[in-house]
Amino acid sequence: MEPNRAFHEAPLPLFAPAPGSAGDEAPLAGAASVACGTRPPSYIADHRARLRERFMQGGAAAMPDYELLELVLFRAIPRQDVKPLARRLLDRFGDFNRVLSAPPARLAEVSGLGPAVLQELKIVEAAAQRLARSRVMHRPVLTSWDALLDYCHTAMAHGEIEQFRVLYLDRKNVLIADEEQARGTVDHVPVYPREIMRRALELSASALILVHNHPSGDPTPSQADIGMTNRIVAAAEVMGIAVHDHLIIGRSRELSFRSEGLL
């Protein structure tokens, strides 16, 4: 196989195939070749067993990003050395979180990454977001504020384009809906106050929390951010709806408009 030619894996079944079964993928660039329908070499099997044991004993905290990424890749590539692909992904995107949150089109540019790997990465990303979201949905936000911030960071901190979310709350400040309002470019996202108010009325929401990310990693608000927030607040006041906060999610921290005196 040509060194830079990406292979495409066969779809992965729910349960890993038994040793010696069919369904192995074509060799990865830079990976050891294993004949289809054969057991992986002992050094690959031993390495995988050691990593799995370390994970079960010490958890993810005991593992660097490249080893945690290898564990994810094992399911999609059951009979080949996945270390080269894990290294290429981290070299391209920087860390484990940014690999998971990278757009599918950019992931597909990485040599050796086909549909099965892409699917596995996106399943892990979706699972992480679903877990974080479950800790805040249908709960009072004021008593689960840290969990809310964790969810916002999980869902938005590593995105490469701006996205704008609206969290809709009922009269008891219970989170009743979390909806993405818009996606934009690397430094701009279009937001329409009228659409936010229309949706708030449909949900019988009494309050809102606005959330958007800054792909640059710096959560400092721009004048456009401040102006947009003021327009939403003005529209909400007319409808008798409170805007509790506007959070800007950066790479490693967030900024609260209310805490900064901007709201």
UniProtKB/Swiss-Prot annotation:
Coiled coil: none annotated. The keyword Protease applies. It holds the Pfam family UPF0758_N. GO terms for biological process: proteolysis. Keywords: Hydrolase, Metal-binding, Metalloprotease, Protease, Zinc. Zn(2+) binds at residues 212, 214, 225. Belongs to the UPF0758 family. This is UPF0758 protein Pden_2304.
